[in-house]
Amino acid sequence: MFILTMGLNHHTAPIDIREKLVFKETEEEMALVTLQQEKSILENVIISTCNRTEIVAVVDQIHTGRYYLKRFMANWFQMDMEKIEPYLFFHEESEAVNHLYKVTAGLDSLVLGETQILGQVKHAFEIAKQTATTGTLLNKLFREVVTFAKKVHHHTKINENAVSVSYAAVEVAKKLYGSLDNKKIVLIGAGEMSELALQNLAGSGMTDITIINRTKTNAELLANQFQAKVGAYENMNEHLLLADIVLVSTSAAEPIIKQAAMQELMEQKASSMLVIDIGLPRNVEHDCSYIPNFHLYDIDDLAGVVTANSIERQQIVLELEDTIESEVRNFFEWEKQLGVVPVIRALREKALDMQEVTMTSLENKLPGLTEREYIQIGKHMKSIINQMLKQPISELKEMSVEEDATTSIEHFKRIFGLTKTDVTIIEKEQAETRS
């Protein structure tokens, strides 16, 4: 079994490619199940955010795994494999694990040190667990990376004063308008990104905020938190006509702000309008950027603002490299020890079988034993067995991570009289439990 990661992110693909390869939240479970049915795929988790789409998989062979991951992506998004291949990256084994540690801790994010990705990775893992597409390896790996990410944010300054995409949006508005006092803002969408944007807007002193959302109750809930107004979705253009700044972040699959409508609207509008599209797929047609006085920014346009004050956090990332490498080594040592688990269980079961035979013999030869005496003898015998096996099992685990592990383990089995059948039975039981 091998760990293989395939994906694309803000490093490898522009937004016009990324937005075509986003898994819809309503289709997450179906995507996981479909991928699990591909040849070579043993376990899988899909992470899909505004800046990355990545698949972490356990495969039976690296070469075939790479092919079937690519084929799945091409089929799912109905695109030619050759068209998406230039934007994809692959990480294998230790590189894949190292990458996941960095992603989860926010060390590979557009916003260095941001914590939102931690929640997104946890969500992706939980969905995969519920859908039964994870097993022994990915369950262990994702628990470890989530724990590590929490420690990083708690014990370092990586997320201290970290800018966010929504923060960058406010900074762009300040550069264009100077003071944001008395500026009218319209926020389209009422999800997590919209809430983060509102937090930054409130911190900038803006008070004239209108929230528009297709589901009005969601807009009302958000508006109540920030003393904002709620606008009717069907009257969106009327609100845009009065707006100075528009932030758009919805889960719509197609643009909701169209070039033709905006061309007409801007001809009626007396002032310029800043439109910041932080949705993926994008919520505003790109051709709107050609309309006079219509200043359009998308996520990639905000990148320069986001990275402007990240020098200190980049230093923290470098300092964490050795720690991550240590975590990666620990994971693969644990994985190697997985191979001896059936041997350990077979040894314990053999010892317990011997105890059971001995206790039956004692019962026959010493019929005068009381029930209490019989139980006490059994407990002491089990204690002796555990003490006798403790050191050999510890040595076996050490052997499992050495270069000549296979030979050493075979010697161990022969010394303790463990047959191939003894171990195979345990392995089959484990496989049935995992499935």
UniProtKB/Swiss-Prot annotation:
Reaction(s) this enzyme catalyzes, per UniProt: (S)-4-amino-5-oxopentanoate + tRNA(Glu) + NADP(+) = L-glutamyl-tRNA(Glu) + NADPH + H(+)
Pfam families: GlutR_dimer (PF00745), GlutR_N (PF05201), Shikimate_DH (PF01488)
Residues engaged in binding substrate: 49-52, 109, 114-116, 120
PROSITE patterns: GLUTR
Record has NADP as a keyword: yes
Residue numbers binding NADP(+): 189-194
InterPro entries documented for this protein: 4pyrrol_synth_GluRdtase, 4pyrrol_synth_GluRdtase_dimer, 4pyrrol_synth_GluRdtase_N, GluRdtase_CS, GluRdtase_dimer_dom_sf, GluRdtase_N_sf, NAD(P)-bd_dom_sf, Shikm_DH/Glu-tRNA_Rdtase
Gene Ontology MF, one: NADP binding
Active-site residues per Swiss-Prot or TrEMBL entry: 50
Role this protein plays: Catalyzes the NADPH-dependent reduction of glutamyl-tRNA(Glu) to glutamate 1-semialdehyde (GSA).
Note: During catalysis, the active site Cys acts as a nucleophile attacking the alpha-carbonyl group of tRNA-bound glutamate with the formation of a thioester intermediate between enzyme and glutamate, and the concomitant release of tRNA(Glu). The thioester intermediate is finally reduced by direct hydride transfer from NADPH, to form the product GSA.
The family this protein is said to belong to: Belongs to the glutamyl-tRNA reductase family.
The name this protein goes by in its record: Glutamyl-tRNA reductase
Organism: Listeria monocytogenes serotype 4a (strain HCC23)
Source taxonomy: Bacteria, Bacillati, Bacillota, Bacilli, Bacillales
Gene encoding the protein: hemA
